[in-house]
Regions:
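Metal- and O2-centered redox machinery and metal/ROS homeostasis
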Residues: 31-48, 92-94, 113, 117-124, ...
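Short, charged, amphipathic alpha-helical segments
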Residues: 73-81, 109-113, 135-141
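Alpha-helical segments in soluble extracytoplasmic regions
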Residues: 56-96
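Bacterial N-terminal signal peptides that target proteins for export
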Residues: 2-12
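Long, amphipathic, charge-rich alpha-helical segments that form helical bundles/coiled-coils
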Residues: 85-127
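C-terminal amphipathic alpha-helix
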Residues: 43, 117-162
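C-terminal segment of classical bacterial N-terminal signal peptides
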Residues: 17-25
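Immediate post-signal-peptide N-terminus of mature secreted/exported proteins
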Residues: 26-70
């Protein structure tokens, strides 16, 4: 029993250490500005990250009670994976949308700001928890942004200066 507790603390410490050592920010496009935007693509990318967080959350919950080394190894890997994907969502919202696409001159600026902030808060909460309801809320919050960034076709040369 004491050995299991020691292993569990070692895994927790290892997980936390890996998260800090591997901390990176996701690049959500440039801030040159280049004038090339594909907002809908970034929404889809965030949804893909959220689905990955959902899968990671399910697997973390499945592996939580297992004590064999392989299961504990997989548990740590899924925790790290969940953290990285949630952090990527936060980075896309802050570095791309809030820095470049949400403008103070927009008539609905406050509403947009609140809805984008809600995505960041939801992503933070899924990092802190393994509750699938929080993942559902994250997906719902991301989907709430689609109305601002509908899918459209890019024409060849659309962003080139003449």
């Amino acid at each position: 029993m004491q050995q299991q507790r020691h292993i569990k603390w070692l895994l927790i410490f290892s997980t936390i250490s890996m998260l800090f050592l591997n901390a990176q920010t996701a690049n959500a496009h440039c801030q040159v500005p280049c004038g090339i935007f594909d907002d809908y693509a970034r929404i889809k990318i965030m949804l893909e990250h959220a689905v990955t967080v959902d899968k990671a959350t399910d697997l973390i919950n499945e592996l939580a009670d297992k004590t064999d080394a392989q299961s504990q190894n997989q548990l740590v890997r899924w925790v790290i994976n969940k953290e990285e994907h949630a952090e990527d969502i936060i980075s896309i919202i802050s570095s791309y949308f809030l820095a470049q696409r949400v403008k103070t001159t927009q008539k609905d600026y406050e509403k947009r700001l609140l809805e984008h902030h809600a995505v960041m808060v939801s992503a933070m909460k899924v990092k802190q928890n393994v509750d699938t309801k929080l993942v559902d809320k994250l997906i719902q919050d991301i989907n709430a942004l689609i109305k601002y960034y509908p899918e459209h076709e890019h024409k060849e040369g659309e962003n080139k200066k003449k």
